[in-house]
Amino acid sequence: MKQPNINLAACILWLLSIITAVAAETDAERNTGVFARNSAARNRSPGNEPPGYATRFKGVTWDVANWRLTTTELDQGHYQSRGSVANGYLGINVAAVGPFFELDIPVSGDVINGWPVFSRRQTFATISDFYSFQRSINATNFPWLDKYGGDLISGVPHWSGLILDLGDGNFLDATVKNSTISNFSSTLDMKGGILTWQYTWSPEKHNGTYDIFYQLVAHKLHVNQALVRLEITPSRDGNVSVVNVIDGYSAVRTDFKGSGQDGSAIYTSVNPEGISNVTAFIYAELSGTEGVDLSSSSLVDDKPYIHMNGSTIAQSVNVKLRAGQTTKIDKFVGAASTDGFKNPRQAAKEASARALRTGYEESLKSHIAEWATVFPSDSTEDYTIPGKKWLPLDHHIIEASIVSVVNPYYLLQSTVSNNALAAVKNAPLNRGSIAVGGLTSDSYGGLVFWDADIWMQPGLVVAFPEASQIFSNYRVDKYGQALRNAQTQHLSSKNDTYFSPDAAVYPWTSGRFANCTATGPCFDYQYHLNGDIGMQIVNNWVTTGDTEHFKSKLFPVYNSIATFFSQLVEKNGTKWTVTNMTDPDEYANLVDGGGYTMPLIATTLKYANQFREMFGIGANQTWNEIAQNVQVSRDQASQITLEYTTMNGSTQVKQADIVLNTFPLHYTEDYTHDNALRDLDYYAAKQSPNGPAMTYAIFSIVANEVSPSGCSAYTYGQYSFSPYVRAPFFQFSEQLMDDWSINGGTHPAYPFLTGNGGANQVAVFGYLGLRLIPDGILHLNPNLPPQIPHLRYRTFYWHGWPLEASANYTQTTIQRATNRRPLTSADPKYASAPITVHVGPANNITVYSLPPSGQLVIPNRQIGSISTVPGNLVQCQPVFSPNEFAPGQFPISAVDGAASTKWQPRRASSTSSLTVTLPDHASSATISGFAFDWAQAPPVSAKVVLHDEPLHPVTDPENGDASGSSPTTPASSVTVWESAKVPLSDPYDPIKIDLNMIMSYKGNTTNVTLPSTVPATKFATLLIRGNQALGPVEVRAGNGTGATVAEWSIVRSS
């Protein structure tokens, strides 16, 4: 072990680099449309913070101080543009124009949601755990298990509709004509958990206009309640109706129970299909200001906006409007189901009535206060400049700031707070885990996958350990069924394998029952889920420090999973393996010796013995022997870890698999950083563009840990969210492209909280290098990419103690959080004792001590300053391209020091350009040449231009990109290299190349040595055209994607 050594020279160099970056940033800003739209933010001064930062999405701005996303673009009938609210118990998805039910408008003839239901896309509402029982499901993994049935989430009637009806066929609902809406804006307020709309409605053939304001909340403290407000300000007097609609169209997979009036309220009720002893009730009641005649209330059913469904009910009231005066109508919703309340009708009725008595403003106030408690300002990463609260004018950082808030926000919407539980006398409301689409979508049937345990939980539990109990509570609740599942091996290839009564196995998908089903088999499929649950359990203990809970509730589950694994494995020579299984890469099913599953089994058995000894049970020596001898296959020539024993080089990978061994598994048994780096580079090249939105978060974290140079972790970090988020509210889609006809046939899940969960891990586990290892040591390995000037990390918990950390490029400062109390479960031994901190890889640890008070300063690794290509002047420097690029193939990829990331323009048929800003310290340097790595798709032609003035005018993405245009060239620019036909260093030869061979990454490269050195300039631009990887047909049609640039280095003369 080495002791820390602060290098003064390195600190001075860092300071110079920051000054350089700030100076260079001004030039880089001039060359991007997003920066151009943020031009008003340039004139910043203390107390003059900009109200909002423009994003790349037209009309969408980000208010970083108040955590608000606002859009002025109205996009109706498309699932991507709809907002949602949820509180952990109730969830609802609503139309883009207001809190209405909405059916999707077909896009390219498609309105279908994905596997396994393949139902029509529309707005959705549900209640936590409201699962149905289905005799069969439209699509499955193992159809022969269909005879045992399965469960899918059921909807509840869509409860938020308030329709303004003018009569004569003029009404305001989701189908209102876009042309009648002006001054539109809609805002998602994530500090308050509020969704609002504001616009002017000018109905056709109607002499008058109406200023409209809608507001929607699902109460975070009183989770049986929801609130809707409608404000109407007319241009003329008039009599109208406002209709309180509870729309049964969203109550999918339910049986109608009953509906009607109950006093001044209306209600409806449904059972989930196949579950007759569970009922959900929805109550709704109105109040209003002067002009709202509540005594006129009557049921209506003959309106075009009232869908004819058994569980639909609507109530109309007369409203007298006065010109220029605002009339308010408030809707108070109560909801409950048998799963959480013994008398759901009474619970729903009382919730609605209580909200009405409390009043809208007071109810809203308590809701906002609870969100502030649940989601404090220090619980997300803060990218603002210290002391100024400004974001750097860099669109990458602006979007990173947005997702640092939306990621935990969307996950927290599916959790119930401790205060909320207390308010319902600890009803069992926080035990359902989080489905792929949360509570606002029935994507993936509303089922729970590994997504919850390994993608959503880790980044959430470190900052919100109490809310995150929902993950472990679910697995504990289903533990009894998991024990029974292990005894169903006779339905699988393991029919001759003995599993003891204390062995437990969880199904791949689960809902109400967690039994083995056709969508969620327990055997012959993704056994790794069980080890993922084990990791989730360890994360829970390391963050909360609740050893008693761990011992009594969580360890029994962990021990039973270990027992199952120990009986599942088979001896193969001297090694242990698992046959007929699937690793996380679902493109390879029913294989042997999964390259992630086997290390996961070894780690689970190792930790299980550690915990057994800790609790006085004694280690199982057979488990130790298995753990030390699991089969992990590796190609001998390339040293690439294989996903399965028969894998060959033709493999294309669906999602993160082998790279999971480095993180989150932290597997190091005969697995070095060199192995991890080889695997990362290899599998990054094998990653399918049609894979789901979470893989690149792991790539970022692993790259930050094992890369010896460059800043590819930053590139991968951008890739983890940028291509997947959608306007206006930065919700994740499962896919890079939503059109199933071009994305490999996937109807993407939306919202895809798995993507949020993955991206939510990048900063804390990547840049900070936090590892949740159950050894009583705080493990960190900080390395902040040079593109980020400063980062304050989320407050995170370790053994129940809140810690805060912040970083610049050279160092990270960590201390006990001064504004947070420890959890009640916090390990008391750290109350007055220091925390031991290990920094660095296991074979090169530096030991620190974090005192109970005071700070610990840790030097960052600063790998961005280590040149992959010696003498490279532009590694990790600001870049800009005016051209559209293939999804995720960012311009920054070309200079991040890693060949595994690539810039790829969208079109090969036109000239595309990439401009890099050279650092100020290069102003006196001379350039001797260039090094290019073109990966597998070199351009036909290329040239490099040096210049001191911007080569391109500002190009606004809102008005189209500059593809196909000829770049303007300043008179002072110099073309220093040009090739009309870029030579191939590694041309594809189908006779010599065996596609089945597993080979480490090798790209086509071009090394250029200039005839004589040339002075460095402020900018250098690479222009490329064509793509030598395209076939003749694509070239003639002119519709192929552009060439790839994996790395462009500008080499300084020695």
UniProtKB/Swiss-Prot annotation:
Keyword Hydrolase: yes
Biological process, per Gene Ontology: trehalose catabolic process
Protein origin, superkingdom: Eukaryota
Record field: catalytic activity: alpha,alpha-trehalose + H2O = alpha-D-glucose + beta-D-glucose
Positions annotated as glycosylated: 138, 178, 183, 207, 239, 277, 309, 495, 515, 572, 580, 620, 648, 808, 844, 1004, 1007, 1039
Cellular component, GO annotation: extracellular region; fungal-type cell wall
Record-listed substrate binding positions: W450, D451, K654, Q655
Enzyme class, spelled out: hydrolase
Described function: Cell wall acid trehalase that catalyzes hydrolysis of the disaccharide trehalose and required for growth on trehalose as carbon source. Plays a role in virulence.
Family that this chain belongs to: Belongs to the glycosyl hydrolase 65 family.
Protein name, entry field: Cell wall acid trehalase ARB_03719
Organism encoding this protein: Arthroderma benhamiae (strain ATCC MYA-4681 / CBS 112371)
